[in-house]
């Protein structure tokens, strides 16, 4: 029985992917105005279908609550009229972005007269695997459509009802614009095997992008025959150099940790130069503790903070290199910039690293030697975001160096091909 079920599911997923492949062919040369019209029509459809979408979302939330999911998880899953309006606004924003397809990124003429251009083209079919965030269903579908890609959307089972309801509204927009319905498809079953069947279809799917916790990303990477671009964990460090201005150190530490502690570009570890730790740690630690942050410190940092009357606890060995996604911060005193670079090289996740310093030489060295998708000088780790960097909306922040590194906007959902024009040239 299980084998028959598996064969049936495999055939169903292949049929779904084949439909996406056909849609991708049409989207690769679709009129940009038609794509934008679909996005705007989808936004209007979400508004009209609000009652239905919220009803399905309420069922998802109730089931997740009954399954014992925590408050933060339920908050990510929950939709309300304001959040739905935000999803609609995001569709209008994406419609207003510049279409990357067909952009000429370079051109030159060879001595033999050949005219050569490099132009952006869609990737093809993108499989998005993500956890219980219904908004990702629409964001991913919209970004893929705008960049000429077909999207296969695999939400976590807890968000399946919400995602199907949102996808129905998106399909209405596609239909009104005369684009293929298979341009954006939600996998209609919660069966985990469906994901693995899709990940085996490297003849039909061009890229898989997992967004979620480490276990999800490891599972996708281990089982996939399709190239995987990982939106992995953000173990982001803030290093306070010897010359760091105290108030700036306080401001950046607070913003990085407290503004939204549950996101991937939140600061997870504070490193402080030994020569300035006595001056910097007490005000920074006090501000963080007053904001409700639990400080998990190495022995040196713990001694300094305790002496200053700041609440702190000893760090466990595994606190360094951990993505807390909560009001928890690992704190370590390092000997100098070399010590900070060594720590980041060992514990960083290639996401975002930041330094606070007045020393230009230290700043430039930090930029050169730190391996991360974004390196901040006197700016919060929270700025590693497509919108904040001026890229527009993003599908995720890649910690994989191939094919994109950092926030993935529309351009990162394309590749490039060469267009070569001659006059009967032979080699």
Swiss-Prot record:
It is an enzyme of class 1 (oxidoreductase). Keywords: Amino-acid biosynthesis, Cytoplasm, NADP, Oxidoreductase, Proline biosynthesis. GO terms for cellular component: cytoplasm. InterPro entries: Ald_DH/histidinol_DH (IPR016161), Ald_DH_C (IPR016163), Ald_DH_N (IPR016162), Aldehyde_DH_dom (IPR015590), G-glutamylP_reductase_CS (IPR020593), Glu-5-SA_DH (IPR012134), GPR_dom (IPR000965). One of its GO terms (molecular function) is NADP binding. Pathway: Amino-acid biosynthesis; L-proline biosynthesis; L-glutamate 5-semialdehyde from L-glutamate: step 2/2. GO terms for biological process: L-proline biosynthetic process. SUPFAM superfamilies: ALDH-like. Signal peptide: none annotated. Pfam families: Aldedh. It comes from the Bacteria. Its EC number is 1.2.1.41. It is found in: Cytoplasm. It catalyses: L-glutamate 5-semialdehyde + phosphate + NADP(+) = L-glutamyl 5-phosphate + NADPH + H(+). Belongs to the gamma-glutamyl phosphate reductase family. Catalyzes the NADPH-dependent reduction of L-glutamate 5-phosphate into L-glutamate 5-semialdehyde and phosphate. The product spontaneously undergoes cyclization to form 1-pyrroline-5-carboxylate. This is Gamma-glutamyl phosphate reductase. It comes from Anaeromyxobacter dehalogenans (strain 2CP-1 / ATCC BAA-258).
């Amino acid at each position: 029985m299980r084998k028959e079920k598996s064969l049936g599911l495999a055939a169903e997923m292949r049929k779904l992917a084949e439909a996406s492949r056909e849609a991708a062919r049409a989207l690769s040369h679709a009129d940009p105005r038609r794509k934008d019209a679909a996005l705007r029509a989808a936004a209007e459809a979400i508004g009209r279908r609000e009652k239905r979408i919220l009803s399905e979302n309420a069922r998802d939330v109730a089931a997740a609550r009954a399954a014992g999911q925590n408050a933060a998880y339920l908050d990510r899953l929950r939709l309300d009229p304001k959040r739905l309006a935000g999803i609609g606004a995001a569709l209008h924003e994406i419609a207003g972005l510049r279409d990357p397809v067909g952009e000429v990124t370079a051109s030159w003429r060879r001595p033999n007269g050949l005219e050569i251009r490099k132009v952006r083209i869609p990737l093809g079919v993108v499989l998005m695997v993500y956890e219980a965030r219904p908004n990702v269903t629409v964001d991913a579908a919209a970004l893929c459509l705008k960049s000429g890609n077909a999207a296969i959307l695999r939400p976590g089972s807890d968000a399946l009802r919400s995602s199907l309801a949102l996808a129905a509204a998106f399909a209405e927009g596609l239909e009104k614009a005369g684009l293929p319905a298979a341009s954006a498809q939600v996998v209609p079953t919660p069966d985990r095997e469906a994901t693995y069947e899709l990940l085996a279809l490297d003849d039909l799917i061009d890229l898989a992008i997992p967004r979620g916790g480490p276990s999800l990303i490891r599972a996708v990477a281990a089982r996939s025959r399709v190239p995987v671009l990982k939106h992995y964990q953000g173990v982001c460090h803030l290093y306070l150099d010897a010359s760091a201005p105290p108030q700036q150190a306080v401001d950046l530490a607070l913003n990085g940790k407290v503004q939204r502690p549950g996101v991937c570009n939140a600061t997870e570890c504070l490193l402080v130069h030994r020569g300035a730790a006595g001056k910097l740690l007490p005000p920074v630690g006090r501000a963080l503790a007053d904001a409700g942050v639990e400080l998990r410190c190495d022995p040196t940092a713990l001694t300094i903070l305790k002496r200053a009357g700041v609440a702190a606890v000893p760090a466990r060995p595994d606190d360094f290199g951990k993505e807390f996604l909560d009001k928890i911060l690992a704190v370590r005193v390092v000997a100098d910039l070399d010590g900070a670079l060594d720590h980041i090289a060992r514990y960083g996740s290639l996401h975002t690293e930041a330094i606070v310093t007045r020393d230009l030489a230290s700043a430039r060295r930090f930029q050169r030697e730190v391996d991360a998708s974004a390196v901040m000088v006197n700016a919060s780790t929270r700025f590693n975001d497509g919108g904040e960097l001026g890229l527009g909306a993003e599908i995720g922040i890649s910690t994989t160096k191939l094919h994109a590194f950092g926030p993935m906007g529309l351009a990162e959902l394309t590749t490039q091909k060469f267009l070569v024009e001659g006059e009967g040239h032979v080699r």
